[in-house]
Amino acid sequence: MNDTFLKACRRENTPYTPVWLMRQAGRYMAEYMEIRNKYSFLEMCKTPELAVEVTLQPVRKLGVDAAILFADILLPLEGMGIGFRFARDEGPVIENPVRTIVDVKKVRVITPEEDVPYVLEAIKILRRELAGKVPLIGFSGAPFTLASYIIEGGGSKNYIQCKRLMWEAPEAWHELLGKIAESTVRYLKAQIAAGAQAVQVFDSWVGTLSPEDYEKYVLPHSKYVFDNLKETGVPVIHFANNAGSMLELVAAAGGDVIGLDWRVSLDRAWQTVGFDRGVQGNLDPVALFAPKEVIRQKVKEILIKAGKRPGHIFNLGHGIHKETPVENAQYLVEVVHELSSLSYEQLLEA
């Protein structure tokens, strides 16, 4: 079995730096589009056989060191009593946004086996199909990011409704985030029970907050999630996008591995979160549109900053873009494996 990813999560030595890509199963791949042209996005998520096939495509095509379940962070919402749909080119639309204490009271905590059985079934099939070739990562949204969709009614630039509820009705805010946090714990524990060998918690939009607001309104709920996952013994990755101004707080919330975006310098960020945990990242996803020699140089720079310290997982600083040339994604995996196999002295000369 290729267990380099799991070893890196535990900060053990590996022969090379493991690499996988956020959103690695996606629209930049022709194989994905063949399926996507026949089915809606939600049909793909809710049909285990399709989710399995799409999860496996980048493992076969790119040679990545981990598979990540094909799903969406909003899937648990239906079980919480919140309807949503995906509008073409618009992203998710929440049908009944939560904006008052009355709305919050109606939100339920999920029962994963009843509410998202298709996710758990896909994980079970994937473990059989992967047959130990690479580990399988499960995932969920973080409490703040899920709350931002639920309150705003979809994606947002300024998060006005979200921040308004947070500041005007803190009791309602904390009750809502408490329910989301408990749902997240149940969801991830169910994924782990079904066979996920690591999980990632995506806090994609938390960068909209000041460090003070994060600490007061979000950190306790994120910490609840990470504290409750410790007993599973499975590595947990905490990815907080655009959170360079509050990495100490993100690390305080928890996670065995802290995911970094490209806006921070990996060496300084690792020092900030502490060498007692791993880091994941952190190539700018747009670098995959650059010439191969530029990709190679950027990979080299990141690996030098990691300094051959055990516990680095190579990834992009956010999801891969849909227009990315697939051959550049393949090249990225090759060059990470090649350069990270060198000694530090050889890497400097490469």
UniProtKB/Swiss-Prot annotation:
It comes from the Bacteria. GO terms for biological process: protoporphyrinogen IX biosynthetic process. The record marks D72 as: Transition state stabilizer. Its main location: cytoplasm. One of its GO terms (cellular component) is cytosol. It is an enzyme of class 4 (lyase). It is found in: Cytoplasm. Substrate binds at R23, Q24, A25, G26, R27, D72, Y149, S204, H318. Pathway: Porphyrin-containing compound metabolism; protoporphyrin-IX biosynthesis; coproporphyrinogen-III from 5-aminolevulinate: step 4/4. Disulfide bonds: none annotated. Its EC number is 4.1.1.37. It catalyses: uroporphyrinogen III + 4 H(+) = coproporphyrinogen III + 4 CO2. GO terms for molecular function: uroporphyrinogen decarboxylase activity. Homodimer. This is Uroporphyrinogen decarboxylase.
